[in-house]
Amino acid sequence: MSEVRKNDHRLMQVLLAPVISEKATLVAEKNEQVVFEVAPDATKQEVKAAVELLFKVEVNSVNVLVQKGKAKRFGRFMGKRKDVKKAYVCLKPGQEINFEAEAK
């Protein structure tokens, strides 16, 4: 864990954006989890350290997944949206991240 904490510059690049969707909102209300879009090469340990550093909360666990990009048609050409790596961050009881307050 101390090896991950040493490089704070790397941790600032791990979290790309919070995922604000219907599913992410339901997960946040039910299970005290927050969903982030993360860098494609980010590890669970880096995501945990980045969330703890940026939001000053305690993280219980991290689950990651890679959402494959959809195949889309651009005129007569077929293209593909980029793959997105998401992290479901489970916070310890009593902890929460309020994005409205963080933005102000």
Curated annotation (Swiss-Prot):
Which domain of life does this protein belong to? Bacteria
Q: Which InterPro entries match?
A: Nucleotide-bd_a/b_plait_sf (IPR012677), Ribosomal_uL23-like (IPR013025), Ribosomal_uL23/eL15/eS24_sf (IPR012678)
Print the keywords alphabetically. Answer: Ribonucleoprotein, Ribosomal protein, RNA-binding, rRNA-binding
* GO-annotated biological processes: translation
Q: Name one GO molecular function term.
A: structural constituent of ribosome
Q: Which GO terms describe its cellular component?
A: ribonucleoprotein complex; ribosome
Instruction: Please give the function described in this protein's UniProt entry.
Output: One of the early assembly proteins it binds 23S rRNA. One of the proteins that surrounds the polypeptide exit tunnel on the outside of the ribosome. Forms the main docking site for trigger factor binding to the ribosome.
The cross-references to NCBIfam families, in alphabetical order and at most eight, read: PRK05738.1-3, PRK05738.2-4
What's the subunit arrangement here? Part of the 50S ribosomal subunit. Contacts protein L29, and trigger factor when it is bound to the ribosome.
* Protein family according to the UniProt entry: Belongs to the universal ribosomal protein uL23 family.
The protein depicted here goes by the name: Large ribosomal subunit protein uL23
